[in-house]
Amino acid sequence: MRLARFIIVGAAALVLMGCNRLTSEGLPEGVLYQDDLDADTGNWILESDMDANARFAEGQLQLEITSPNLIAWAELREREFGDFVLEVDATQLGGPDDNSYGIIFRVKNPSAYYSFDISGDGYYAVRRRDEADGGSWTRITEDWLQSSAIHQGASINKIKIVAQGSHFAFYVNNEQIAEADDDTYRSGAIGLNAGSFHEPGVKVGFDNLIITKPE
């Protein structure tokens, strides 16, 4: 069960890694951005402090949460996406199964974005964070529903979002598990996130990110 509330890692914790500007030059037709996440290209803003660490290691972008009730993320630098299809492989590397990891998208600032998260014990949630209400959470789908599509424990899960206008579809391991409509945010940045609840020690690795145009 999801009982705890997250504390968000603040903007003061941001560590800017490199200054390379993103470009779509050389990408296949229809591909907006692609990154195997094997090494730091300078395209990501990484959060790092005593409570959370984001780094490139072992051929992945890894997020480690060392405090309870906290979420942290790595954000793609200098790019906004409105309509897109995003796919990424996420692997639980350590810590309790009562965790959270996934994608934040259409990010306006640290207090305004959508999130699609799954957990190591087989749940998922789609939520919106609202700056106007002090960073409160709004459920886009029913909060933390169980799905047999999610591989539990120390496993790899392929996470996918299709965003077209105000309509979203959410997939895990090639199975659609939810869809929703919301028009609060029309475009914004994207990020990869991980979070803890009562127990710290959550560690997640991300691989093989690709963002394409919807068909």
Regions found by a protein language model. Give the residues of each.
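Short, aromatic/His-centered strand-loop micro-motif at the edge of beta-sheets
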Residues: 134-158
